[in-house]
Amino acid sequence: MTEFKISDLLVKPLSESFSCIVCTDLLSESHDKIQVNQCPHGHCLCSDCWTKQIENKKKECPICRAKVKLEFLSRNLFLESEFKKKKVYCKYQYKEEKEDGKIIKDEENGCKDIIRIEEMETHFKNCQYAFINCPNGDECKINSRFRKNQLEEHNKSCEYLKVPCQYCKTPIAKINKDHLESECQSYKIKCTHCKLEMLRMELSEHLEVCPEMTIQCKYKEGGCQVSFQRKHQANHLASENNHIGFIQNIIDQHRILLDESDRCFKRLKCSHETLEKRLTNINKYSNQWVIENWMQKVIDIPNDEVTSTKRVSCPMFYFNSRKYNVSCFPNGFTPANKDYISLYLHLHEASPNINIKFSFEIVNSDPTKSIKKEKNSYFQNDKGIGWEKFAECKTINTLGEGFVVGNKLTIKFEIEIPQTIDPLTTK
């Protein structure tokens, strides 16, 4: 629709006091934001001229040269109040489009109201002469733009007006001619086989039992390819020795499918068991640590206060996203246990208390003589956990006892983090 300025709608011309002293347009052309700004000496300009003037390097009133800033302009409330009281025609008195650049009054169909400028916004929202689009759908091409008070007349010819179907009461556009023929579930139709009349919603249930409908033998899967009307089904099934051969074919096919299903089930069961084992082992770690040149390490790491921090350590390893290693004191961790081998498990990161189950085993060439110990404990304060007196040195280091083989000592270890399940609680 054409945009109208207030100056286009004035009933009477206004005095110069309501015009901008620079461009001579009205001080405000918009009805939704009427604001008259003035310089400190009372000179009034429209908002566009004030903006241009302040964007100029001089930033001054064009009349009195007073320095101004947009945010510091004062409002002329008297002029604003007087301006709002002036009379204008409703913009819907005019035709929607200009002709030759001019607005044209619609003497026959336009709004005849004369209102104050301050009433324009409220009036425009409620004016029955306002232009609207057809509310029945964007597809409407016949007079799809009209005045609000012409809606009832428009609906008489609008093919997109939705009216309740006389059978199912569903709102349907008048142009939808196919509704009764293909959609309406409450419309009566005839079965194409037996010609019985029924509601469309009843047809699918009827077709399951219609005696005139042509069907295939229910033993088609077994090889019978005959088609017949449903009412002849009993006679057909009695033929071919009661279809015993076809029934046997179906049984054989089902047996083959059953065997294949059984094989598939066994494969899935095997995969399930494999995955279950992997899940069980995901919280376990086992390995062995081979310490070469063992007897020399026994000599190089004596038990005394000076060397008590010396040890043999295995390479770092990762388990459950944490870094660990194992350390061995060939002659004990402290003088009090100098006759024993000390073994410890270490966690190399700051971590809350972790409950851990682990075992060490010093391997003997005779598996029945291997020395194995288990423990369930917590890591605390970054200290290792293990045994100060794991095994007597003389037992391990005596040649011929089977622990040191080829000057190598082998220590197996296994780590497990027990899974804890919080109890279910209802408050």
Curated annotation (Swiss-Prot):
Cell location: Cytoplasm
UniProt entry tagged with the keyword Hydrolase: no
TRAF-type zinc finger locations on the chain: 122-178, 178-234
Zinc fingers typed RING-type, residue spans: 20-65
InterPro entries recorded: MATH/TRAF_dom, TRAF-like, Znf_RING, Znf_RING/FYVE/PHD, Znf_TRAF
Domain notes from UniProt: The MATH/TRAF domain binds to receptor cytoplasmic domains.
Name the record gives this protein: TNF receptor-associated factor family protein DDB_G0285149
UniProt source species: Dictyostelium discoideum (Social amoeba)
